[in-house]
Amino acid sequence: MLVLKCSTKLFILENMLKSHFPESLKVYGAVMNINRGNPFQKEVVLDSWPNFKVIITRREREAETDNLDHYTNAYAVFYKDIRAYQQLLEEHDVINWDQVFQIQGLQSELYAASKAVAKARLLDLDINLASFKAVHFSPVSSVPDHSFLTGPTPRLTYLSVSDADLLNRTWSRGGNQQCLRYLANLIACFPSVCVRDEKGNPVSWGITDQFATMCHGYTLPDHRRKGYSRLVALTLARKLQSRGFPSQGNVLDDNLASINLLKSVQAEFLPCRFHRLILTPAAFSRQAHL
């Protein structure tokens, strides 16, 4: 096991991961953020360098953690050989198994392999799997049309940390203190876009997570069918692209409104799927918010 700390090697790794798109996109986004100030206090673990077979990004061990905060306690995985992934987890302390955490990736064997590792280590864990369509936005070469935002309001801008409570209340995965803190950190660290009404309150928004993934795109019910979601998505994609980041996202199979929106802006549905595992030790099973 190797924790890659050298800044030169981390930039080399960033370029190496491009040749493994789209499966490496989650790890690639995390590595890009590490190389640009590392606001989420992540680090890279590999089986070897430079001829690696598996890469895992994780929270730095010295970073402050909350054992119930699976949003922040999230690992991104890319492997060339699934056996190398299993071996790394079985033989080394790559993961903190004593807290609620996530494993994210774009490879189909992730769930079965992670479950096998937990069994081999005799761990009493509940593993919750969610699978999504993975998407990538085409280059947004021009500023999205926002001429319909006439007058001083509504206006296109970005989120502030004070908006985190609204996002926490409206996100299907939110509604708890861990999520509130996580969303506030995302807003503080990464690009966001929102439309605000005449009172300055957000009515439509999108944010970016620790893996440079566009997420939590949402419009309040009273403000739907006005073109806000499309405007927010394209503006956020363009903002990420202008900074050199991939404009990637995920969508549930039954979220037809979002799927139709993505089709309308010519987003590419990737051949791989996004897999999110939430792993909960038995000791936290009644406390965790999934």
UniProtKB/Swiss-Prot annotation:
Pfam families: Gly_acyl_tr_C, Gly_acyl_tr_N. One of its GO terms (biological process) is lipid metabolic process. InterPro entries: Acyl_CoA_acyltransferase (IPR016181), Glycine_N-acyltransferase (IPR010313), Glycine_N-acyltransferase_C (IPR013652), Glycine_N-acyltransferase_N (IPR015938). It catalyses: an acyl-CoA + glycine = an N-acylglycine + CoA + H(+); (9Z)-octadecenoyl-CoA + glycine = N-(9Z-octadecenoyl)glycine + CoA + H(+); hexadecanoyl-CoA + glycine = N-hexadecanoylglycine + CoA + H(+). Its EC number is 2.3.1.13. It comes from the Eukaryota. It is an enzyme of class 2 (transferase). Keywords: Acyltransferase, Lipid metabolism, Transferase. One of its GO terms (molecular function) is glycine N-acyltransferase activity. Pathway: Lipid metabolism. Catalyzes the conjugation of long-chain fatty acyl-CoA thioester and glycine to produce long-chain N-(fatty acyl)glycine, an intermediate in the primary fatty acid amide biosynthetic pathway. This is Glycine-N-acyltransferase-like protein 3. It comes from Mus musculus.
